[in-house]
Amino acid sequence: MNRINILDCTLRDGGYINDWEFGKNNIYKIIEQLYNSNLNIIECGFLDPLGNNDTTRYNSFETINSIIGAITKKQSSCKFVSMIELEKYNSKNLPILKSNNPNQITGIRLTFRKSAIEKFIKIAKEILDKGYELYIQPISTVSYTDKEILDLIDVANRLKPSVLYIVDTHGSIDWHSYNLKRIFTLLDNNLVDDVSIGFHSHNNLQLSYALSCELINISTPRNIIIDSTLLGMGRGAGNLHTEMICNYLNTKKIGKFDELNIIDTIQKYIEPIKNNNAWGYSVPYFLSSSNICHPDYVSFFLENSKTFVEIDKLLKRIAPNEKLEFNRKIAKECINEK
C-alpha cells in the first residue's frame, strides 16, 4: 500500500443522492473508469440484506464481484471494498472469502455507534474470521472523548484491522477547535504500526479539501487513506472531490492518477445525476455543521418551509444528546415548541 491512498466512495456515499440507482451499466463503467484512473481503493456500495442487486445497495456480492472480475485486466494494487451498517449485518449474507484473488470485494467497512461497541467487536471478529480486511468506521468520531478514543484504539489493537477511521459524520470538524490534529495524533501515537488511519469528511464547512491536505502533509510513516467522491457527490454539502485531491497528489508527485479519465467519468456519469439532484454548499447545511447536528434535521425543517434563521433557532433547541442521530419526533417537537 502507498503511504497516501485515495478511497473513492461515490457508489456508496454518493448513493444518498439517487437512492443508489446508478444503473447496472453505469455501475460497471464507473468502477472501470476509477480502476483505469489508478484509484487505490474503490468502495462499490453497501452490502444490505434488504438491498437490490440492480443498485449499489446490493444483497449479495455475486453481481458486484462479477463486474469487478470483468473489469480487472491489468496488474494493479487497486482494492475493492463494501460497507456494512452494524445494525444490518447478517452473517448469512457475508460469504467466506474463498481465495486470494484481489479482483473481488476483499475489505469490509463496518460502521457503528459508540453505544454499540460490544456488538461491533463481535461482528468485527466474524468479518475478520471470514478472511476480509476490516475497516473500522466509528460514526461521529468527533463526539468521542479522549478516553473513548483511547478505548477504541485498544479495541483496534486487539482486533488488528487494516484501517481505523476518523469519521466526520456531520461535517463539523476543523483543524483546531474540533481538533482533527488532536484525534489524529492520539491514533498515530497509540495504534500499532501496521494499522492505517482513514479520514472520511463532509464538506459542510468547505474544509474537506484543506483538512485532507493537512493530513497528507503530516510527518508520519503511517499509511493514510482519504475518502472522496467524484464531483463531491453526497447529500447536503457533499464530500471531498476525488478530482481535486487526486490533482493535489499528482502535483506533489505523490500520486499517479489519470486525471483526464477521472473528469471524463464525471462528465459522462455524474454530471447527469447532478442536473436532477443537486448537492453542494448551502447555508442550511452549514448550519447543521455549526450546530453539530445530523443533516436530516435540516432536511426536515426545509421540508416544513422554515427560513434559514428559523432553522438555526430550531437546531439550537435540540438537546446535545439528540443531535447526532436524526429523530423525527424530536424535530416535530422543536417545530411545535412555542
Regions from the PLM with identified roles:
Residues M1-K338:
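Catalytic cores and adjacent flexible loops of soluble metabolic enzymes
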